[in-house]
Each structure stands twice: as C-alpha cells, then as structure tokens.
Swiss-Prot record:
Name of the featured protein: Protein-methionine-sulfoxide reductase catalytic subunit MsrP
Taxonomic classification: Bacteria, Pseudomonadati, Pseudomonadota, Gammaproteobacteria, Pseudomonadales
Any one Pfam family match given in the protein's UniProt record, by short name: Oxidored_molyb
Cysteine disulfide partners in this protein: none
Molecular functions (GO terms): metal ion binding; molybdopterin cofactor binding; oxidoreductase activity, acting on a sulfur group of donors, quinone or similar compound as acceptor
EC identifiers of the protein: 1.8.5.-
Amino acid sequence: MLIKLPSASGSKESDVTPESIYLSRRTLLASSLAGLAVTALPRWASAADASRYADVEAGKAPGWFADKLPSTQWQAVTVKDEAITPFKDATHYNNFYEFGTDKGDPAKNAGSLKTEPWTVVIDGEVGKPGRYALEDFMKPYQLEERIYRLRCVEAWSMVIPWIGFPISALLKQVEPTSKAKYIRFETLEDAKSMPGQRSDFALIDWPYVEGLRLDEAMNPLAILAVGMYGRELPNQNGAPLRLVVPWKYGFKSVKSIVRISLVSEQPKTTWQSIAANEYGFYANVNPMVDHPRWTQARERRLPSGLFSPNLRETKMFNGYEEEVGSLYAGMNLRKDY
C-alpha cells in the first residue's frame, strides 16, 4: 500500500526523568504513518539540524556508516506533537535479554558485543541468496531518519528517531520467489559476548527469532535500522542492525540481526514459543486486547515516575492505523493477536 504523507510538522524535544516503575516479563522467565510528515533534508544542511542531537553521546561509527550519514534524508518521517525521548533514557531503559533481564542490564553489559566485522546471511526463498559483510549489505540503500513511536508490550512507550531503510528495498534486491510468504529474522547467538545467553533462563531457546508476513514487511513503515539520534546504533539498542515495525509491540523488533530468511510457512517466534497465549505472532498494538496480566488500553510515556506516571491512552496500531489497518482487513484481531 502507498502512504499518503501530509505536510511537515515539528517534533518537540524535552527532558525526561528516569523511569522507576515498570512491568516486566522477568516473572514469566523465572517461573519456568497517522500523524506522519515528510521533509527532505539531504545532509546536515544547517547548524539547526545538527544541534538537534548536540547532547547525544558520540559513538564509534564504522567507516561505511560515517560515509553514508551525510546523505541521510533527515526527518523523512516524523510524528506530530510528540516529544522525542532523550538519548540517555532511550539507551538505558531497554529489553534485550541476551544481556540481562533488568532494564539497565543491556547498557551495562552490551559493551562486550563486537559489531565489527559483522555478517548478514540472506537465504531461503530468494533468487539472490548470499552472505554479506555488513558494509556490502548496506551499499545499495539510502538512509532515512524515521521518527517513530515505540510501544512496549509492558505498557510503556518512547519516541525514537531511527536511521535506516525500508525492508521493501531489501526485498527488491534479493528477489523473493513465489513461495515466499513470510520473512524470518534471527539474532546473533554468542554466549561469550551475550551474558544473558549463559543464564539459567532455559525457557528461551536461543537465538532470538522473529517474523513478519511478507506484506507486512513490504509496508513502507517497516524498516531495518542501523542508527538512532543521528549516530550509529548503540549495542544495547540492537547494533549494528535491527528491525523496527512501529505498529507492533517492541518485542517484534528483533535486534543484532545476523540472518534474514524468506520462508513459505509462518516462523515460530521466540515469545510465541515461550507463551503463545500471551505473545502472539502478529503482536499488533491493540488497546482492545489486554495482556492476560495487565491492560493494554493505556501506556506510560517516558518520562514517568511514581508520582508522575505520565499515562496516556494507547492508540490502535500505535497510531498508525491509517497506514497499516488494511493489512488486517477481515481478521479477528482478538484471535490473531
């Protein structure tokens, strides 16, 4: 489907206090574009553009990323009347169980992950399978900044400025066969650098696996991200390559991807394997379908705290119903959650 993008609107930035209260899936583990806008800014064209991320901690960008960054299409997609979550909070309040189950564990432990060199395998039902160094994998793609809402299944949310490219561009390159119906994503499995994979949480069968229907992956909102906040992805946020599907709960957006497979059958995903009654394959943000242990009708937008929870009503498809609703026409979204 095509996205009709209305006129540009600005996203505000504001400070945020660290989150102190959150819902967590650790209990389970231990027990067994609406409002979109587009504007083309082909490079860091002005001091104002660069200053938006002046407070962002500098990373160690790989050469290929540094070379591509100046031609990024800045603010290619934005959201109206939304404050961008400050970088510190977006990088220190994370779910990435490969590095631990507490929200601060990924930032504390992910420094051990080596992201250079990095290899991505493309296989399955494609005309052009291959094994690529990440710098070669990225060569064909124009980077875009996409400012998206992020809604976690745990009922908290952020607004993140990602840098990446549409999955549809990748699919055009690899040429799916007529048998391809789904796309399967696989995270790195490396217990040496990922301490969470060495833990006693045997319920997770590594590597982490996620998937999309092919038409979902083709939607213009679905991207593969390599950066955020004007720089490369930090390790704790899924470096060097992660999925971003803003109308779905955050656990669908698999991190540190090493394999992308086109398949004919619906892949069995990690959380679906652990608790299918709680985490379905589709995982679309839906305020009408509660998690068995908490409501999904509301969310806590960071910043929030004990005395300032910053609650808001959750929007269908996380506010992207106009862009993605037709993908699920005729489906029972209570059954296919």
